[in-house]
């Protein structure tokens, strides 16, 4: 499918979901057997504090914890003490190792005044300057601006790299911080959470978002029609589950909030809300994601660098418990309702900070895995942040000047691809790939969505994981194209990968296709 002419992001999503993926085209190589599970394993990252708010990291065992889901006791399947997540202070690799939690700093320019944002950046700089030159665990720095979520610095252990990125934050007036743009900021802020979840879903272990700024505005459901309310609630439920699935906790730091405003604060409810109360019931709000992801809101304090430090510690010293829901898989389990999780300790003087629950599948709105994958790659291709869950790069480009199109040839590493065994000792895997040509103002000039099938003559998982696979997509490249971004995900919702080409790279990798042979008319 080709979309010609400038398109908005919403239009791209509409066309992709409406028309879906064309028939998968056979390609070569690849595959690992996919193992289906009929049970769900729920992960809980739990920070324990005493009455004075001090973090408790020792003296507790599996038997000290009790878990209920909607008042039903759950049997603890596994238990990890905080020392299991201790960072390797001597590690030199910037890649998250899945043991120590990683930190994602988000500077919220979109929802801040110019003065507030300047203050928040100064406080962030103060915090970083107080850190060791080599961080104990990788961290990355993002900026939520007027139009996009931008990755300023990818995962690194270098304080110098983070400070450099911070000092070069683009100067921009947050013009959307007015009532006329309230809805736009609401969606942009929540979509930023979705993008971060997609980017990090292939990274094992806990991730902590430290969101520096107010966060997105809430919305009043009474002002919307029933159809709109239903779509909004499903949008929020999906975002909650994306954070849960990626094991992300959200910490929100907004120093300018007055104490008397706390009842109006998004997500001001605690995670111990009355059973059956939907945390997004009534108004949909950004702070609800804090509670349901096991984070915390900090407000009415100007010591932001210390609050960042507190957030990082709360997200770094924790127990991990897992359990299989007792009635998972039953017909009553697919009602789409919120599953309230409560964790208690044998010692009543101790309290826990953990996520409040998750949303069950909804049989009245069944998940179409193909459409969900299309939505995922559409978000990834319109984002500027890297996606490394699926390693891929452009190998070459063959231009067709007569049609202003190009064949983009890719190499995809099979490490995170899910394979299925087939007859004759073979394996197969399917990808959904989306390529987009962008103008200098990030308008969508052209796009191509297609399915790609890989096959391999082995079922050996080690051999399959080491394959380099070839794929190709033909995309229109109009004369005013300034960049191309290609995103892909396995059809069953595995890791997402993305690769980018600026105009210089497009030209340097390109070769011109030979002109088509002319056929002489027969005499």
PLM regions with names:
Residues 9-22:
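Bacterial N-terminal signal peptides
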Residues 25-523:
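Scaffold/interface architecture of coatomer-like assemblies
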Residues 1-7:
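N-terminal secretory signal peptides that target proteins for export/translocation
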